[in-house]
Amino acid sequence: MKTNQSQTAPAEVRENIMGTMEINPLLLKLSIPMMISMLVQALYNVVDSVFVSHVSESALTAVSLAFSLQNVMIAVGVGTGVGVNALLSKSLGEKNQSRANATAENGIFLSLCSFAVFFVIGLTCMKPYFYAQTSDPVIAQQGIRYLAVCCIFSLGIFTQTMGEKLLAATGRTQLSMISQLVGAVVNIILDPIFIFGYCGQALSGTTGAAVATVIGQFCGAGMTLYFNTRKNPDIQISFKGFRPSAKAIGRIYTVGLPSIAMQCVGSLMTFGMNLILMAFSATAVAVFGVYFKLQSFVFMPIFGLNNGMVPIISYNYGARRPDRVKKTIKLAVCYAEGIMLAGFCIFQFAPGQVLSIFAASDAMFAIGIPAMRIICLHFLLAGASIVLSSVFQALGNGVFSLIVSVCRQLFVLLPAAWLLAQTGNVNNVWWAFLIAEIVSVLLSLGFYARINKNIIAPMYSPAE
């Protein structure tokens, strides 16, 4: 690995693309590969659910119940990566190579620690988790087999996620996209082979879905390892004599912990919604699970857009270029709202067609079609909220994102859903999403006004 300053200087000059290239093409250059990458990531759970739905509705329900804890696992990996991404980009913008290297090394260490935690969870917590949500032993056992494999072999997803964030932080989003594609293609190929028993009954059904998923994740992780060691000269990673730095870890989690908490709040929301909907029927839970898988194809491109946006904002924040920061935010909001409008049209005008992908029963169609049409109304407001949430993180104010997320999903959505469920009509429950989104966008706009006044506007003054 490169060690002397003369070798790192050219890399720093090249990295100035985030400070000099016109914003619109730069945002598209960094975001489009990440948007594709995030769509590919959405395929992991969606493909599992599509194939599993052809096994039985109980298997589909089991995978839906597993999603809450799966999302916590993803939250830890992605949230830690968000902290690494923002701080590494900011360090490069400040020309602080040693801090950039330390951020990357400690980020990798944290991803290994995360794997150790979920390895233990996979061995000890599966039964209580599922039986807290359902009394049906068939659904519970199918879920246990699926989620235990995902947790025990989670090293792949944690190393892949961190590797992708390191590539994105240095502007190499195309390589991150390739890593995602490799993992997803492997998963798609292996899913039917395992799920339908071609590798034996012991690895069929939900167990097979999990095995295919983790193999795909390990393949993606291998690609990120190769790209970061061979194709990413702008960070020099060396674990010779490495010791975890409390200071570096603290900086990472100052930005990343709100993101982790925010996504974990989402897991609590899905867990709570499952409990509310199970009072109606297991089919209602399956419909909610299918909705969550389908909506990922709308939301994931915006998360990819944010992944391309964050390093641009962080870099120019470090370089004190407020004009570029504000233009990046405006363009990102416009693109996000365009994506959400497209998603709204699909869910509003073709809900039956998308449900049919999951071998939906008549009962699923009866609940699912009105559910899709009602829930998608909040898409029209969500784009701005999602972008502003990442803006807060990129500017070191991730706590604002956390406040918005907690208010939206715990203080508004779940209570509203519970109250609407008391009407005895499951269709009324779905209106809680629109109610919560209205609160979310109002809070986000208020916090952005504060960020603009206290952080962005002062950058127009010369640094002292």
Residue ranges and their predicted role:
Residues 20, 24-43, 47, 69-76, ...:
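Residue-level signal for short hydrophobic patches within transmembrane helices
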Residues 81, 150-168, 176-184, 209-224, ...:
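Short runs within selected transmembrane alpha-helices of multi-pass transporters and secretion channels
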Residues 49, 86, 127, 165, ...:
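Small-residue-mediated transmembrane helix hinge/kink sites in multi-pass secondary transporters
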Residues 122, 165, 191, 195, ...:
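Structural signal for membrane-spanning alpha-helices in multi-pass inner-membrane proteins
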Residues 1-31, 88-155, 201-257, 313-378, ...:
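Short alpha-helical transmembrane segments in multi-pass integral membrane proteins
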Residues 29-48, 149, 160, 183, ...:
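Transmembrane helical elements of multi-pass membrane transporters/channels
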Residues 60-120, 157-176, 287-351, 382-404:
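Small-residue-rich hydrophobic transmembrane alpha-helices
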Residues 39, 43-61, 130-137, 193-204, ...:
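Helix-terminus/linker motif at the lipid-water interface of multi-pass membrane proteins
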